[in-house]
Amino acid sequence: MMNWTIKRFDELTLDELYALLQLRNEVFIVEQNCVYNDLDGKDQPAWHLMANEEGKLVAYTRILPPGVSYTDPAIGRVVTSSLKRRSGLGRELMKRSIEACEKLFGKISITLSAQVYLQSFYESLGFIVAGEEYLEDGIPHIKMSRKPSW
């Protein structure tokens, strides 16, 4: 059974912090072969949405308040364990992240920086392209935005 939790940075246990940094490192740095500084100073003001299964973190997003990365709230560091890919967990993770944004900040636009190969996935969740393609840490990205659902 999947256990979902959302916490502020100062509410995370040391084990939770270690697990989310480990998952982000495994996927974004090792698996994607992308050397970058994951610790960017944005974890502290963020909300951290975590999915645990049998005591192991298997999916995670970082939800940033308005004004941290963009004018709008932002969803970032979207990650699922390689063992859980193609199971629908990523879609569930994003749906819960959108719901969390709406609960925390009201029904306002949400922004994210998507890896280009995932553009259609985010479009299926109501996001639209909001800028030109650009390189972030050597990987093609595109800014996307989702208008509030009324």
Name each region found by the language model:
Residues Q115-V116, L135-W150:
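C-terminal "cap" of GNAT-fold acetyltransferases
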Residues M50, K56-P66, D72-A74, V79:
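Conserved beta-strand in the GNAT
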Residues M1-H48, N52-K56:
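Short amphipathic alpha-helix that is part of the acyltransferase structural core
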Residues T80, R86-E99:
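Conserved acetyl-CoA-binding loop-helix of GNAT-fold acetyltransferases
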Residues L39-Q44, G67, L135-E136:
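A short beta-turn/loop motif at secondary-structure boundaries
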Residues P66-I75, R85, L104-I108, G138-P140:
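A conserved beta-turn-beta hairpin within the catalytic core of GNAT-like acetyltransferases
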Residues M94, C101-A114:
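Conserved GNAT acetyl-CoA-binding A-motif
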Residues V116-E132, D137:
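Conserved active-site alpha-helix within GNAT-family acetyltransferase domains
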